[in-house]
């Protein structure tokens, strides 16, 4: 039984700790997005959804207490279960892959899958960092910081500071152009955030609407980027300007079996051909996609030249450049509307967000095959290939 993506929507991406979602819980944000997603398929009886699969990199605090179950009950009904999964930066893409796999296995007909992350409310390493002593004895790089892995990748694959700054500048320019053209408008769910607080002893409320990605800096220049200090290593090349932004966001797709979409009279937009992961030395975490991409192509029976467009998560500029260099990707078809350096990287949300962006841009360009790929903390890579219908 084949699985198909029927629709997909995302929130705008907020700047962590100072953006429009800084005080907004991601379970609330997910409910907003999923309710909108369901409303776009009026034929759907939401109580018949088999499961809601939510990717989340830090499922604790406001994202804990089995957050997926809370989301499923509030967004679709108490009859609908929910499960939270974690493959760190790839969690959203993994959630879609799991939904597709369940349909293909005959374990259900309708799934909502995607991801969430609030980097405003939850610390990047969680509330209690507790590395394994035994693991560190075996290999101290098992728990190495992501910025240091980026520096290791830059050194090993000879990525220069100049190339990294230029890549970062281009990410912002492409993203700014996309926003000015309204390319993300149809996929973003406007979210009204209501805030209640005490002022002069009185209860005060105010609201604002977030409907545009907040991290893009049209005014940035290569010169300005070149003046930033290294963020992780003395004499290194990785700066705040060439790193992905800390962000808040949510993104979800609706996955159905062929039997179900025909029964409902719904037209699918794409299918996930395959999705697979690979492992690499944690020291060179960012190169993970180089392991995952060939595996995905082999499983799909495709060549790299068949992939007309790729969304490569820009964890760091040097990391993205190394992946493009080592995997043989065509730079002209990678992140055509900018990437995480400009648009942000809400960890567990990103894989689903990139999938939605990819499918919409493939439609505009009338393309058949596209790929989403990302490195994953701890030394992994993931690649998912989509066929637009």
Role assignments for model-derived ranges:
Residues 21-110, 115-133, 188-210, 283, ...:
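Conserved beta-ketoacyl condensing-enzyme motif
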Residues 26-42, 67-71, 95, 146-153, ...:
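Short, well-ordered amphipathic alpha-helical segments that serve as non-catalytic structural scaffolds
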Residues 1-26, 221-287, 291, 298, ...:
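Condensing-enzyme catalytic core mediating Claisen C-C bond formation in acyl metabolism
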Residues 187, 273-342:
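Active-site pocket-lining segment
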Residues 24, 58-109, 141-148, 219-245, ...:
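Conserved catalytic cysteine-centered active-site region
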Residues 87-116, 154-184, 252-259, 324, ...:
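Active-site-proximal alpha-helical scaffold in enzymes
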Residues 10-12, 23, 27-32, 43, ...:
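N-terminal extracellular/periplasmic Venus flytrap/periplasmic-binding protein-like
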